[in-house]
């Protein structure tokens, strides 16, 4: 009876406690339960604490259900409400935003943008505040910042107005007047192009050129006895100056192709023909050196047939003139053939309006600053004209002809030197006249902007490629380490990281010795271009890396020396000077300055410098040779040692040198001798015709009658680079 009353009282108390479960957690509820039972019924505490929900299935189910409801409610109350899309802050963005502009639009610090771009494919270190962000990265920053993106129509649709200068439309035929032809003399090196031009000009240009080869484009206006004028461009024939020859054909009307009658068609001859065909320029053939006994003009004409240059003698339209630049033979005939072709072409130009032309060559003069040689193609150039070429502009201060005489005006087809450039334009740049200095600056700024846009596109392309590489590497890592235990994975990654750590000082020194940093300075833009084109053919980076640190036009400067010291490089100068102060500074800092006036000498020097960075090659030099006549073995201690009985056939055998065993043309063994005996006596040298017995430092080698023993010494010889620049 007492137990039933006790059970009823427990049920009543249980209902009271259940009402409190809505506001109390499980732990607090159990603590209160324990407290209530222990204070009211101390005698039955243990029983009351365990039995009501452990023994009664109904109570146990009710309590379990109550706990579940309370737990769900508490969890629901603990969850923070998700921010709705409407509550996100909208950020107005546009294409091509800079880091600074994006931070300002978000009303955040710039660091917020950098933090959002961390652990992405973009290179944070190279990211500046003015760097433009691609659409992908703008979206990434907005997303990580918990904001909503909104495209700005005004900014997105706004396109920068094109401010570039362009050529004028074609002139009215009524305004055109006849002009002199622009003739380019082309051909293989040393076929007499400059000597031929000397005869026409009655000058000695060839004698003044270093090494007797042309290394610039020379532009000259030649007046013939008949009163006709021809502008000649003398292009280099050397292999290194391919770009100059190509540039020469772009501004020319006629090409005089010079081929030596005793040498025939050569590599640069073929290249010159191709340049002329690409530019759709007619050719006049000048077969030079016809005064020589071995001259064969007909052979030259036949060789040219293979390159689609068909002379009039063979039914073609190419005029061929047999000349001798040395004696002056048929010089007038060549000039007349050129004038006749020019008349057929009906060359005309508009001498009015804004000037148009082309930069033939550019260089920096110490006293006059940047100077260009140009061909005027349209309009009349005068002092004070405002010109734009590439990303440079000029207000013409002075003009001069090929003889250095000042001129006031330059007409179409006239070569002229121009002084007044703010920066040095590149050879081949188009010259356009504009109305004012502000307009010139505007054009240059626009061209720089366009160049920057192109660079940004290339950079973004590289970034995207890098991102894909990282994703691919991450995917491969997951495949590689997916099934590996985390401890093993950590160890493998640690080991790989150790392999990628910076080199030790000794290793770094060895690595640096296989790199040649160079600084190239030239007298004119075209010369530097030619040297860089040759360096582009370098294909021996596996032997020694060729690192172009800096290049430019002008004499060697203090900055060049400091740069060479920083990179442990070599300075190469072509047709430039290095003053005494500069040379002393270079000597003090241990910097090599190498000056040359002939391009192939410079390239040879570069090859030698590259070779000096290579490890020496060990070569084998034979001293003597012996043939094995008999084999036997001797006992030394407890082991048998094989011995070969030999006769020296060539030279002599020296015990201290290296040896190799040859069998059927194959090397069986290389090493040293343990013993060398003549009869029964130890000896160090056995000469030709003498017999000897010898044993090797490797006991497992078995001798056979007829084998050859070669005695040789090893010598270290300097290695040579495998790079062949092509000349």
Curated annotation (Swiss-Prot):
Q: Report whether Nucleotide-binding shows up as a keyword of the record.
A: yes
Which BP terms from GO are recorded? Answer: mitochondrial translational initiation; ribosome disassembly
Q: Where is the tr-type G domain?
A: 178-348
Instruction: Read off the transit peptide span from the entry.
Output: 1-29
InterPro entries for this protein: EF-G-like_DII, IF2_II, P-loop_NTPase, Small_GTP-bd, T_Tr_GTP-bd_dom, TF_IF2_bacterial-like, TIF_IF2, TIF_IF2_dom3
**Quaternary structure (record):** Monomer.
Tell me, what does this protein do in biology? One of the essential components for the initiation of protein synthesis. Protects formylmethionyl-tRNA from spontaneous hydrolysis and promotes its binding to the 30S ribosomal subunits. Also involved in the hydrolysis of GTP during the formation of the 70S ribosomal complex.
NCBIfam families in alphabetical order: small_GTP
Q: What is this protein called?
A: Translation initiation factor IF-2, mitochondrial
Species of the source: Bos taurus (Bovine)
């Amino acid at each position: 009876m007492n137990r039933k009353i006790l059970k009823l009282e427990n049920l009543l108390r249980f209902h009271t406690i259940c009402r409190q479960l809505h506001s109390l957690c499980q732990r607090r509820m159990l603590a209160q339960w324990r407290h209530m039972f222990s204070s009211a019924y101390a005698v039955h505490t243990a029983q009351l604490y365990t039995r009501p929900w452990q023994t009664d299935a109904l109570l146990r189910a009710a309590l379990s259900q109550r706990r579940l409801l309370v737990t769900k409610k508490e969890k629901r109350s603990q969850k923070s409400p998700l921010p709705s899309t409407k509550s996100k802050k909208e950020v107005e963005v546009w294409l091509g935003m800079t880091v600074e502009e994006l931070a300002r639009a978000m009303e955040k610090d710039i660091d917020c943008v950098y933090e959002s771009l961390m652990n992405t494919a973009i290179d944070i270190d190279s990211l500046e505040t003015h760097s433009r962000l691609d659409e992908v990265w703008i979206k990434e920053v907005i997303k990580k910042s918990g904001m909503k993106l909104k495209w700005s129509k005004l900014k997105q649709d706004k396109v920068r107005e094109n401010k570039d200068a362009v050529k004028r439309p074609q002139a009215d035929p009524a305004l055109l007047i006849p002009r002199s032809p622009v003739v380019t003399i082309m051909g293989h090196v040393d076929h007499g192009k400059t000597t031929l031009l000397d005869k026409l000009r009655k000058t000695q240009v060839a004698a003044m050129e270093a090494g007797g080869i042309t290394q610039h484009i020379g532009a000259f206006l030649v007046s013939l006895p008949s009163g006709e004028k021809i502008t000649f461009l003398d292009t280099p024939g050397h292999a290194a100056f391919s770009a100059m020859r190509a540039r020469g054909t772009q501004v020319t009307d006629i090409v005089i192709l010079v081929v030596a009658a005793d040498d025939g068609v050569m590599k640069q001859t073929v290249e010159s023909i191709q340049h002329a065909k690409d530019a759709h320029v007619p050719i006049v053939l000048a077969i030079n050196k016809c005064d020589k006994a071995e001259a064969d003009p007909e052979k030259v004409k036949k060789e040219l047939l293979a390159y689609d240059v068909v002379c009039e003698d063979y039914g073609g339209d190419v005029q061929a003139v047999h000349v001798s630049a040395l004696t002056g033979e048929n010089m007038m005939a060549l000039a007349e053939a050129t004038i006749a072709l020019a008349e057929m072409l009906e060359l005309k130009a508009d001498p009015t309006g804004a000037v148009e032309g082309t930069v033939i060559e550019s260089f920096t003069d110490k006293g006059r600053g940047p100077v260009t040689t140009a061909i005027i193609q349209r309009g009349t150039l005068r002092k004070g004209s405002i010109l734009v070429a590439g990303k440079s502009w000029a207000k013409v201060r002075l003009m001069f002809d090929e003889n250095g005489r000042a001129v006031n005006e330059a007409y179409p087809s006239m070569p002229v030197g121009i002084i007044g450039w703010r920066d040095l334009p590149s050879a081949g740049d188009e010259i356009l006249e504009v109305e004012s200095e502000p307009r010139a600056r505007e054009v240059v700024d626009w061209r720089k902007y366009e160049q920057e846009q192109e660079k940004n596109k290339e950079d973004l392309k590289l970034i995207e490629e890098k991102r894909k590489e990282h994703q691919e590497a991450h995917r491969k890592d997951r495949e590689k380490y997916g099934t590996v235990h985390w401890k093993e994975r950590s160890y493998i990654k640690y080991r790989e990281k150790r392999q990628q750590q910076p080199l030790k000082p000794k290793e770094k020194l060895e690595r640096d010795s296989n790199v040649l940093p160079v600084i190239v300075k030239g007298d004119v833009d075209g010369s530097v271009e030619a040297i860089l084109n040759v360096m582009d053919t370098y294909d021996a980076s596996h032997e020694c890396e060729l690192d172009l640190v800096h290049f430019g036009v002008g004499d060697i400067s203090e900055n060049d020396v400091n740069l060479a010291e920083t990179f442990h490089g070599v300075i190469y100068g072509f047709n430039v000077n290095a003053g005494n102060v500069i040379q002393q500074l270079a000597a003090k800092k241990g910097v090599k300055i190498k000056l040359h006036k002939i391009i192939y000498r410079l390239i040879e020097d570069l090859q030698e410098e590259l070779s000096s960075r290579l490890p020496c090659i060990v070569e084998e030099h034979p001293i003597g040779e012996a043939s094995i006549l008999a084999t036997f073995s001797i006992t030394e201690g407890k082991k048998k040692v094989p011995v070969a009985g030999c006769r020296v056939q060539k030279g002599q055998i020296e015990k201290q040198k290296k040896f190799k065993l040859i069998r059927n043309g194959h090397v069986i063994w290389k090493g040293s001798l343990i013993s060398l005996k003549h009869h029964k006596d130890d000896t160090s040298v056995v000469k030709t015709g003498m017999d000897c017995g010898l044993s090797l430092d490797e006991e497992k080698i078995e001798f056979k009658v007829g084998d050859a023993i070669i005695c040789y010494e090893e010598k270290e010889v300097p290695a040579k680079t495998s790079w062949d620049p092509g000349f």
